[in-house]
């Protein structure tokens, strides 16, 4: 049994969710449905909110001290998923 940290990104028609999982438990959760982001989404271009989500997720990941995370590939690696992962990598999180 491997005990790795996994990044899972879930997309719905209206929102994005990003979780960091360890042994099936959520350690860090960020979504566009959170009050902080939801109020600002209407004011910005919808192409920017995956970046906002990535910056918030990287801040929370750094608070916990996680540096190496494996990506659970549930979606194709392009578009919003790629944007979130690129922002995480730019902020120093190593994604495998």
Swiss-Prot record:
GO annotation, cellular component aspect: mitochondrion; ribonucleoprotein complex; ribosome
Record bears the keyword Protease: no
GO molecular function list: structural constituent of ribosome
SUPFAM superfamilies: Translational machinery components (SSF53137)
InterPro entries xref list: Ribosomal_uL18_bac/euk
GO biological process: translation
Subcellular location: Mitochondrion
Keywords noted in UniProt: Mitochondrion, Ribonucleoprotein, Ribosomal protein
Record family assignment: Belongs to the universal ribosomal protein uL18 family.
Protein name: Large ribosomal subunit protein uL18m
Naturally occurring in which organism (per UniProt): Reclinomonas americana
